[in-house]
Amino acid sequence: MIDVVEIQKILPHRFPFLLIDRVTELEPAKHIVAYKNVTIGEPIFQGHFPGHPIYPGVMIVEGMAQAGGVLAFKSMSDEHQADIENKVVYFMSIDKAKFRHPVRPGDRLEYRLEVLKHKGNIWVLDGKAYIDGNLCAEAELKAMIVDK
């Protein structure tokens, strides 16, 4: 299990844009399971939508991408782990995105990502987001690890 303190050592994101709270399962170069607790206190709900708060789909996809970044960094060889602070993950593409169910304050988003392809510093991931075991969003993500 990886808590938010450890996640912040891996990812450069910070509040309000750090979108994963904990990693519950990780098999390097294979898959990751992480979650985010969605709360009404998040600034995004001031405008999306007043009186009818819905967590934006782009934020769900970004949360998937952040979980994928943790997976990619934790899959680096031991000798490269010390160099994580000098690296960052960039999005290359988002494909096949589908939003199947709205996400509201009080929901716990569970991100499940599997590696479809990995070559060098490029990763292709199948990402899915669930609430209480029900699929709410999915996308295929491509990202690249680069020097800062």
UniProtKB/Swiss-Prot annotation:
GO CC field: cytoplasm; membrane
UniProt-annotated catalytic positions: H48
InterPro entries in UniProt: FabA_FabZ, FabZ, HotDog_dom_sf
Principal location listed in the UniProt entry: cytoplasm
GO molecular function: (3R)-hydroxyacyl-[acyl-carrier-protein] dehydratase activity
SUPFAM superfamilies: Thioesterase/thiol ester dehydrase-isomerase
Keyword Isomerase: no
EC number(s) recorded for this UniProt protein: 4.2.1.59
Domain of life of the organism encoding this protein: Bacteria
GO biological process: fatty acid biosynthetic process; lipid A biosynthetic process
UniProt-annotated location(s): Cytoplasm
Catalytic activities: a (3R)-hydroxyacyl-[ACP] = a (2E)-enoyl-[ACP] + H2O
Pfam assignment, any one: FabA
Keywords: Cytoplasm, Lipid A biosynthesis, Lipid biosynthesis, Lipid metabolism, Lyase
NCBIfam families for this protein: fabZ, PRK00006.1
Entry's family note: Belongs to the thioester dehydratase family. FabZ subfamily.
Role played: Involved in unsaturated fatty acids biosynthesis. Catalyzes the dehydration of short chain beta-hydroxyacyl-ACPs and long chain saturated and unsaturated beta-hydroxyacyl-ACPs.
Xref: PANTHER family: 3-HYDROXYACYL-[ACYL-CARRIER-PROTEIN] DEHYDRATASE (PTHR30272:SF1)
Identification of the protein by name: 3-hydroxyacyl-[acyl-carrier-protein] dehydratase FabZ
Organism, as annotated: Campylobacter curvus (strain 525.92)
